[in-house]
Amino acid sequence: VGEPTSVALVQTNIMQTLKWDPRWLQRWLNENLEWTTQTADAALTVFPEVALPLWVEDLPQGYLEALEAPAKAQGHDVLIGALVQNTELVATHKRAIHNAAISLGAHPGQQYAKNHLVPFGEFSPPFFAWFYRFANIPMSNQTPGGNKQAPLVLGGQKVAVNICYEDAFGAELIHAVPESTVMLNLSNLAWFGNSAAQPQHLQIAQARALEAGRPMLRATNTGMTAYINPQGEVLAQLP
């Protein structure tokens, strides 16, 4: 048994119809700043999937520094979901787009990039790539992060991160379990509205916690944000 730690799981509760509306952008950015101020006493503050509603590279100058400042001042960490554009230094010189979780605060510069992408939403199957190029659908050409990503060191823990429905594929997550002390899922189920998707996804996370023998933390946009113990029991939950 290791040392206890404290984690703040932020549920942003942003409607999907407003999330990408530029008229609301400044409000969402300001609310994130307010959350990090309120949760600075926690060793780790976790935001949900794509909590930053624009590319990291397009954020206002100094925004990430302001976002991490309250936690960093106390030697604490922040993990936030974001869309990241990386230029791969390979012969093709293609841009790599990742649905990622990036670390800020005391241990910045760490990243987990989603590996199991959703076909037709996050990547184009080979025989349909022509259609996506024609339709110019945004964010449909994402790059997998790789299936051997190491746990992130955050809040005094080794955190095995997964994003959205990656936790439905236990065989793809199990490689990180021996090195980790906790599992962490970042999700945005606002796409599914008020449906069975939220309780179903929580049950999937419970199965992964029990299977791995590790606590599972869930930070979601509209629910269900939760702490699940290694026995698969939900000990704390937001609606």
Regions found by a protein language model. Name each.
Residues 1-239:
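Enzyme catalytic cores with a strong preference for nitrogen-chemistry domains
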